[in-house]
A protein has these predicted regions:
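Acidic, proline/glycine-rich low-complexity IDRs
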Residues: 2-10, 36-37, 41, 73-126
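Mature extracytoplasmic domains of secretory-pathway proteins
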Residues: 45-68
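Low-complexity, compositionally biased segments
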Residues: 21, 25, 33, 63, ...
Length: 126
C-alpha cells in the first residue's frame, strides 16, 4: 500500500494553522505506523479475513476514541467540581535534543478524529 508521507519539519508550512496541521499529520503517521500497523502485523497470515476485519475495526475504534478524548468529545469528570482535559502537543527537537518548536494539536485544534480515517484508510498524511 502506498502512502503520502508527511512533510519533514523543514518543509512545514509557515502559516500558523497550516503548521499545526503539518505537525498533526506527522503525529498521524506515527500513530498509524507505530500503533495501528504494529497491532495488525501480529495477526497470523492465515487468520480468516472476517477475523482480521473484526480486529481491525476494534483497533480503529480504540484509536479513534483516544482522539475523541483528546479533542474533548466527552466530559471527563474528576470529582463533583472538576473535570479533566488532555492535551496533545508535538515537540520538535534538534540534533542536540533542544526543543526548537512546539505545536499544540489537541484539544479542539484540527479535528483529529476526522483525520484518523484519512490516515488509516487512505494512508494520506498531508
Amino acid at each position: 500500500m502506498t502512502f503520502l508521507a508527511p512533510r519533514t519539519y523543514l518543509e512545514w508550512r509557515t502559516n500558523g494553522t497550516d503548521r499545526a496541521e503539518d505537525a498533526a499529520y506527522a503525529f498521524g503517521k506515527d500513530l498509524i505506523v507505530h500503533c495501528r500497523d504494529e497491532v495488525l502485523s501480529t495477526l497470523a497470515p492465515d487468520v480468516p479475513e472476517a477475523t482480521r476485519a473484526v480486529v481491525q475495526a476494534a483497533v480503529d475504534t480504540a484509536l479513534h476514541n483516544v482522539l475523541d478524548m483528546l479533542e474533548g468529545f466527552w466530559r471527563l469528570p474528576s470529582g463533583p467540581q472538576h473535570s479533566l482535559e488532555y492535551v496533545l502537543q508535538v515537540r520538535v527537537r534538534d540534533a542536540s535534543g533542544t526543543i526548537v518548536e512546539s505545536q499544540e494539536i489537541a484539544p479542539c485544534k484540527l479535528d483529529l478524529p476526522i483525520g484518523y480515517w484519512k490516515w488509516a484508510r487512505d494512508r494520506e498524511f498531508r
